[in-house]
């Protein structure tokens, strides 16, 4: 066993990330930041980065806003009205900065770009990068998301013909 493996033995794998890239050219090269700040001023900018920070604290990098306590906590962190936070998040979904379907159907926040930007952290840990949650019943507005693809079983056709016995 190598020294790194010995040192890591018995440690719990860290959940979430401690940092994420905040690119210095985001104000001029990111239509998301430009648009959200144009529409909502500094509140838009602040909510977007607080949302990314919040996603980074989550074990699977998504935020299920159906959990009322966690939602109220997030809104309180933003220091603005819930209506403004919702307006900003709706705009982020319309711009596909967060997954539109997960937000509109399930009120779950997931960002492919965020997960891609922190993937190297998980690779260094030797664990799988969290994947976008998938819901068992996509028509329900609430539910427990799955992060593993749902396997469809093939239809079994019987060759038994009862008339030929």
Listing of model-derived features with the role each one plays in the protein:
Residues 1-60:
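Short recognition helix of helix-turn-helix/winged-helix DNA-binding domains
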Residues 1-21, 71-72, 76-165:
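Winged-helix/helix-turn-helix nucleic-acid-interaction surface
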């Amino acid at each position: 066993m190598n020294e790194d493996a010995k040192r890591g033995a018995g440690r719990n794998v860290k959940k979430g990330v401690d940092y994420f890239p905040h690119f210095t050219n985001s104000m001029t090269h990111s239509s998301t930041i430009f648009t959200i700040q144009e529409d909502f001023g500094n509140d838009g900018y602040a909510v977007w980065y607080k949302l990314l920070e919040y996603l980074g604290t989550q074990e699977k990098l998504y935020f299920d806003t159906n959990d009322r306590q966690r939602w109220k906590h997030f809104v309180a962190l933003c220091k603005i009205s819930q209506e403004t936070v919702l307006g900003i998040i709706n705009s982020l979904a319309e711009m596909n900065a967060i997954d539109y379907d997960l937000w509109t159907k399930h009120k779950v926040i997931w960002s492919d770009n965020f997960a891609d930007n922190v993937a190297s952290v998980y690779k260094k840990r030797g664990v799988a990068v969290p994947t976008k949650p998938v819901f068992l019943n996509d028509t329900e507005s609430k539910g427990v998301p799955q992060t593993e693809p749902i396997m469809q079983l093939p239809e079994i056709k019987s060759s038994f013909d009862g008339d030929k016995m």
